[in-house]
Amino acid sequence: MARQNKQEAIYEFIKEQLREKGYPPSVREICNAVELRSTSTVHGHLKRLEEKGVIRRDPTKPRAIEVLEHSIMKKEMVDIPVVGTVTAGKPILAVENIEDTFALPINYVRNKKQLFALKIKGDSMIDTGILDGDLAIVEKNNSVLNGEIVVALLGDRATVKRFFKEKDYIRLQPENETMEPIIVKQCEIIGKVVGVYRKY
């Protein structure tokens, strides 16, 4: 099995069996699936999953395990702010800049620093797959490397470009062959793009 903790593996196996067979696995089947020898260990994991509110069991029945999907979704997702506009001189996450929220898997957010989503306007990054109307998932961070896609503040507007620190200037390179790079002496880097969401 893929490397993951046993509790996660048990939960995923229960969901898989419910999807494929329509009923949950037995404790012995769980043992075999996640490579545990002791049924008491599985019972312990099931008890902890129940305490977390992600499954429900009927102790009078051997296979009565119910997955509480609504609870799972709520526990596994977290909202990040969606920024519609960026105003010079104000924090990126100022209340007046936030238009909405967007749900991301909690594991994704846990491994990053402060995240927000920015609405993309225009087609300057189409060659890298970032299109007008997309939501760019941005990690708030002003320390970036050459070649990374960043959100830079130029005057009173934010722009998403590929960042290059040259000898005497900064080059903000679009990913659109019809557009010229933006050359500036300095600019404020708000963060780097770590993902893109597109609604179909």
From Swiss-Prot:
It is an enzyme of class 3 (hydrolase). Its EC number is 3.4.21.88. Keywords: Autocatalytic cleavage, DNA damage, DNA repair, DNA replication, DNA-binding, Hydrolase, Repressor, SOS response, Transcription, Transcription regulation. GO terms for molecular function: DNA binding; serine-type endopeptidase activity. GO terms for biological process: DNA repair; DNA replication; negative regulation of DNA-templated transcription; proteolysis; SOS response. Gene3D superfamilies: Umud Fragment, subunit A, Winged helix-like DNA-binding domain superfamily/Winged helix DNA-binding domain. The record marks 88-89 as: Cleavage. Residues 27-47 bind DNA. It catalyses: Hydrolysis of Ala-|-Gly bond in repressor LexA. Coiled coil: none annotated. CDD domains: HTH_ARSR, S24_LexA-like. InterPro entries: ArsR-like_HTH, LexA, LexA-like, LexA/Signal_pep-like_sf, LexA_DNA-bd_dom, LexA_repressor, Peptidase_S24_LexA, Peptidase_S24_S26A/B/C. Represses a number of genes involved in the response to DNA damage (SOS response), including recA and lexA. In the presence of single-stranded DNA, RecA interacts with LexA causing an autocatalytic cleavage which disrupts the DNA-binding part of LexA, leading to derepression of the SOS regulon and eventually DNA repair. Belongs to the peptidase S24 family. Homodimer. This is LexA repressor. The gene is lexA.
